[in-house]
Structures are given as structure tokens and as C-alpha cells.
């Protein structure tokens, strides 16, 4: 491992950034408020590694918060985007690539008979909320504490991601009348869902099938199936927000993994291979309510951008079932190794993975809800984060964010990562001053 050099160039750029951006960043969690210290400024990435502007090299387990399932700058994606760029960067018209990517998605998620591309996951979930309300003629939406569905007003109620990291349960600026239409309960509390759904006519029950914006929280056995039953019995639409889980936890996403088909699905991250794109979709019957075939309006200048479509086609094309299985195997090796390190050092640790999505909490016992997650040792996480960073391992700068693997993380990368994390945990246990 090459010794880290001081982050002088990063500090200089961040000082300038704070003059131009709130907190110096364009998304709050990047500001390191959850761990303290100064962010490094990224310069380039390749494969399993990322480099900062000072030349320091890291094994990357953030992977742009999930999209880079093939790793940084995979040749297949670079080639596809380069070829598309030669033909034009944007048209604002239908293109063949839009259809090709939609076909690739439907091939893995057959329940998505029709989709609509957007430029961000927030656009996709906002559009789903509008569609669900229009179709059901109801106004209330049920979400779960700590689940993050983008920064649309309807979803900034007891949300996850940066909202959780900064300790903001809600956001100022959301009208009270609108906030009252978003109901919440604890993830995995099926009894609470049942009570709410019987008392209030719900337009939709929306969830991250595996919560990645409060750390990494899996549904308990029967929870997803129970939501499907309640939705069917009460007339609500079941919505999977698979912006994070889509094509990561299984070849066909949460529907394949859990054997439950939602009414509507939001996708993002992986389907753009690192470029800005998201989508929402469902049955033809539901999606034909969207303009121009129906009255529910949604539009976007850059929706279906040809460069993003090219990146998505290349990514899904390379992400075969065998490649997906191998990434899952390497993720299991990493998580098992991390558990072993914690056990040897006598540290309580809950570490889990599904597919190539993983996470851990410094605490005993399984984590079933955001309240459980908040009982973890956040101070130890902060020290561990910084110790890992100085040893060339880049983790998410928050105890409440999932981590990711890619096809570029092979046995050698996993082995070296575990060696560094072992050393990092030892340092974190002795560094009681923290950061």
C-alpha cells in the first residue's frame, strides 16, 4: 500500500467549492458531516479504484452511490458512450437507443411492460406518486421511516440518505398540507401497515425493498409478501423504489429476489452505468395513464438522453447472470471477512449483503428498522471510516448508507481490502479521540 500524501490540493479545491456551493457540495452527504473531516476531491477512477486530486489511490466501495456495477470507467461503457457522442449529445426526439434500453429492462423485469425514462430517481418517484394518486383517486401515500425516495416534497418526511445523516427528520419548505398526505411507519412493522391501510385510503405503499438509505436493512420474512396482500385488499398500489436495488440484489431485481410483483417500479443508478438516467414503469394498463396517451402529465428535456441510453445498454449487456453471480460471490467474501475481523477483535458487528449491495452496523443483533440502525456505535464508525480512508479504502461517509461492489472487485482486491480494514479497525479501537 502506497503511503497517503496530504490532501493539500483537495483542501484548496474544497475551499473554493464552499464559495460556490452550499457546504461546498452538490449533494449533502458528500460534505462529510456524518463523519467529520474534509472530503477528498476525486480525480479519476478505473476498475475497483478511485484516485483523488492529490494522487492518493483507494479501493472504492461507494461506486458513485451504486451505479458503477461494472466498476469505474469500464471499457465497454466508454466505447458505447464515445460512439454515441459522435452522433450527437442530445436530440429531444425519439431514438432507437431508448427502445433498446427499455427492451433490456423488460427482459429482466417482465412486469415492466412500459417504462418512461427520466433524468433522476427523484423525477421517477415524483411521477409515480402523481400517477398513483391519479389512478386510485386517493391522496395519501405510505412510506417507511428511513427510506429515501428522492427529494420530492412528498417524500421528505422521516427520510433516509443525507436527510438521516444530517439528523433532519423532515425538511423546511415542505407545505404542511402536503406533508400530511405522507404517512410513515417503521420498516418491517406489518401490523402498523395493516392498521394504517384499514384506516386511511392509500394511493400507494412505497418502499425500498432493501433499505439502503438508512444503512442496509433487509425485510423480515413475509414482510414484502404481506405488503402485497394489504395493497390488494385495500386498493393501494404497491411501489418498489429500486433505484438502488435494481439489478444489484438479483439479476431481475427485487421482484425476482422476493418473488413479489409490484404495481409500479422506480429504477435508476445501474441502468445508466454512471450517467444521469432513471425510469419508472409498470403494466401497460397503468402506464397508459401517462401523457400523451393519458391525462397524467410528465415530461423532461433530457429524458432518454442518447449518451445515458448508450451507457445503460452497455452496462446491462455486460451484466450477464454469470457476472452478477460472481459479483455476489465476491461481496459475500468481503462481508464474511469483515465479520471475521470484528469477531477476532471482539467488536459487535451486524454485517449483511444481498447480491452486490452490502452494509454493516457496529452493534449486536440484526437491524430491522431505522430505529435499530440508530442504536449502532456511530462514533466507532466515524473512527473506522477515517482509519480505512488513510489506508486506501473509500467507504460511504455516513453510518447510514449502504455500500456496493462491482465486477472489478476480484479476489485480490477483496483480500487486500480486508487486510487494510483489519488494520483500520484496530486503529479505530485505540483512537478514542476520533475525528
From Swiss-Prot:
It comes from the Bacteria. NCBIfam families: hemL, PRK00062.1. It is found in: Cytoplasm. Coiled coil: none annotated. It is an enzyme of class 5 (isomerase). SUPFAM superfamilies: PLP-dependent transferases (SSF53383). The keyword Cytoplasm applies. The keyword Isomerase applies. Its EC number is 5.4.3.8. One of its GO terms (biological process) is protoporphyrinogen IX biosynthetic process. Belongs to the class-III pyridoxal-phosphate-dependent aminotransferase family. HemL subfamily. Pathway: Porphyrin-containing compound metabolism; protoporphyrin-IX biosynthesis; 5-aminolevulinate from L-glutamyl-tRNA(Glu): step 2/2. GO terms for molecular function: glutamate-1-semialdehyde 2,1-aminomutase activity; pyridoxal phosphate binding; transaminase activity. This is Glutamate-1-semialdehyde 2,1-aminomutase. InterPro entries: 4pyrrol_synth_GluAld_NH2Trfase, Aminotrans_3, Aminotrans_3_PPA_site, PyrdxlP-dep_Trfase, PyrdxlP-dep_Trfase_major, PyrdxlP-dep_Trfase_small.
